[in-house]
């Protein structure tokens, strides 16, 4: 059985949703580097930088990076529809997954941990970095929305890995509210992904409504 390290409200939600869609049995270990968690020491043993999601496969090999995990699951379980069967369409989906990971996902780190890029920032520097980082994040999402139209999903005829990752990472940094103003059709698509019956139960565990 696969083992997924993650915590509620984190990027591990995308991996969890993909595993559910693919019908792959897995167990979860609650672990996060930014808060006390029962599985943190175990996570550090398999992933020294303690990033989540981290997925341990049946053979003991370790997968990190959300895009890489989703690509693997899509290739290993083609019947799931996580990735397209057509090579050209699949190539664009992989491009989109890597775009989100390299640009939008990475940009969250500047908002949450500006001190990683600027040692001991004072309050003014911190706020300036976060403001510029947020503006850049929103710009990157706008570019993504323009480059990856829904037909009717980002993954094509079926909801897939690219939809899942976009709906996860867009929850942070005020991206959704910004997209509702600048790219309302794309924001509406994210809302459709949220309520899809294959995704909604996972989202309810990660982002429970008050």
Regions found by a protein language model. Give the residues of each.
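Residue-level recognition of oxygen-bearing side chains
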Residues: 68, 185, 198
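A broad structural signal for alpha-helix termini and local helix breaks/kinks
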Residues: 22, 47, 77, 148, ...
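Active-site-flanking alpha-helical
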Residues: 74, 169-170, 203
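Short beta-strand(s) of the beta-wing in winged-helix/HTH DNA-binding folds
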Residues: 53-56, 154, 200
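Hydrophobic alpha-helical segments typical of transmembrane helices
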Residues: 14, 39-42, 185, 189, ...
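GST-like fold's C-terminal all-alpha helical module
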Residues: 96, 100-195
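Terminal-tail/helix-coil boundary detector
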Residues: 200-210
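GST-like domain detector, emphasizing the conserved glutathione-binding G-site
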Residues: 1-127
């Amino acid at each position: 059985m696969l083992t997924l390290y993650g915590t509620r409200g984190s990027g591990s939600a995308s991996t969890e949703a993909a595993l559910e869609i693919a019908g792959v049995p897995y167990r979860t270990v609650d672990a996060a580097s930014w808060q006390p968690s029962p599985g943190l020491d175990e996570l550090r043993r398999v992933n020294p930088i303690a990033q989540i999601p981290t997925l341990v496969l049946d053979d003991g090999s370790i997968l990190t990076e959300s895009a890489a995990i989703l690509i693997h699951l899509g290739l290993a379980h083609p019947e799931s529809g996580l990735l397209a069967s057509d090579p050209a369409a699949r190539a664009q989906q992989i491009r989109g997954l890597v775009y989100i990971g390299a640009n939008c996902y990475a940009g969250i780190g500047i908002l949450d941990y500006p001190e990683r890029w600027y040692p001991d920032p004072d309050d003014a520097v911190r706020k300036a970095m976060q403001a510029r980082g947020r503006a850049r994040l929103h710009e990157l999402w706008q570019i993504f929305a323009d480059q990856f139209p829904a037909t009717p999903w980002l993954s094509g005829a079926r909801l897939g890995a690219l939809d899942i990752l976009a709906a996860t990472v867009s929850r942070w940094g005020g991206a959704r509210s910004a997209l509702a103003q600048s790219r309302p059709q794309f924001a509406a698509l994210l809302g459709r992904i949220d309520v899809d019956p294959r995704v909604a139960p996972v989202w309810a565990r990660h982002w429970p409504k008050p």
